[in-house]
Amino acid sequence: MAVQQNKPTRSKRGMRRSHDALTTATLSVDKASGETHLRHHITADGFYRGRKVIG
């Protein structure tokens, strides 16, 4: 089993954690219905970029 030889510094710990931050989902408002949805995804009622694509 690998065991560290020296205690990692606070700086190294912070550098390792630098990529762990969470980001909020980017939302868009549909042109046709005014509904909020995830970017590059269709809305719940089937619109994408102002066009009806499903149903």
Curated annotation (Swiss-Prot):
GO terms for molecular function: structural constituent of ribosome. It comes from the Bacteria. Pfam families: Ribosomal_L32p (PF01783). SUPFAM superfamilies: Zn-binding ribosomal proteins. One of its GO terms (biological process) is translation. InterPro entries: Ribosomal_bL32, Ribosomal_bL32_bact, Ribosomal_zn-bd. Keywords: Ribonucleoprotein, Ribosomal protein. One of its GO terms (cellular component) is large ribosomal subunit. Transmembrane segments: none annotated. Residues 1-28 are annotated as: Disordered. The keyword Cell membrane does not apply. Belongs to the bacterial ribosomal protein bL32 family. This is Large ribosomal subunit protein bL32. It comes from Serratia proteamaculans (strain 568). The lineage of its organism: Bacteria, Pseudomonadati, Pseudomonadota, Gammaproteobacteria, Enterobacterales. The gene is rpmF.
